Amino acid sequence: MDRCCQRATAFACALRPTKLIDYEEMFRGAMQARAMVANPDQWADSDRDQVNTRHYLSTSMRVALDRGEFFLVYQPIIRLADNRIIGAEALLRWEHPTLGTLLPGRFIDRAENNGLMVPLTAFVLEQACRHVRSWRDHSTDPQPFVSVNVSASTICDPGFLVLVEGVLGETGLPAHALQLELAEDARLSRDEKAVTRLQELSALGVGIAIDDFGIGFSSLAYLPRLPVDVVKLGGKFIECLDGDIQARLANEQITRAMIDLGDKLGITVTAKLVETPSQAARLRAFGCKAAQGWHFAKALPVDFFRE
């Protein structure tokens, strides 16, 4: 008896944002994309669910902060000359009781909108400074520093300078062991309030870093205007070091030029999102001083640095 078999094939994919540093998050996105294709009727309602979830997160953040649901993990920053840890970037996580561990991309924009950015930053600063002070008490050379991400709006908050001074005083951390990492923002070089605040922080001895330099709003115009100590290169600059030969050669020239410029200006260039041995080797050959990324270590719990 003749029988007819029908088969259907469905394809789905999840895009990987340039700044993504957690492969588990990318895997969850791929699995969700597959589920959406397999059962589109179910996911037709998911847009409404996502709106509800965003609202739920927004309204529950303050309670979560009071309950201690936020915590920090740290991605080591490596000195390329000898592969030793010289510092770490503090990364915020939310251990939600029902949604699991949430990365900042799920809630930071909510914090910006509901006025919780400064309280969250205060939490991160206090925890990070306390942790790195403990590490420094148990390490010899090099003495580690901690890098804390801060938004332009938080920098401009009237109480931010006093907050930083207070945290440094309470924890006993030397100011030079704290680095404030600023996301690219056009306001940084235009807003006199932001420029003045960064100069005041620099006068305290706090390091100033510009994240994802040269990719978005950030440009060479930042350098003479702001007291910059570190610029971070990431995204395509690093990714293309493993690309096809045409893209690789062009990015090598740009990366070399930025490292050379940093040396001439007394600015440390830190490569981020370094994921392969060949990327690390090229950066080392170019004279890059520091790097971070999955090739060296993923984000680690605080206990790792206490061992």
UniProtKB/Swiss-Prot annotation:
InterPro entries, sorted: Cyclic-di-GMP_PDE-like (IPR050706), EAL_dom (IPR001633), EAL_sf (IPR035919)
Membrane topology designation: Multi-pass membrane protein
SMART domains: EAL (SM00052)
Residues annotated as domain EAL: 54-307
Gene Ontology terms for molecular function: cyclic-guanylate-specific phosphodiesterase activity
GO (cellular component) term, any one: plasma membrane
Top-rank taxon: Bacteria
Single biological process term from Gene Ontology: cyclic nucleotide catabolic process
Subcellular location: Cell membrane
Transmembrane regions: 158-178, 203-223
Predominant cellular place of this UniProt entry's protein: membrane
Keyword terms, alphabetized: Cell membrane, Membrane, Transmembrane, Transmembrane helix
Protein name: Uncharacterized protein Rv1357c
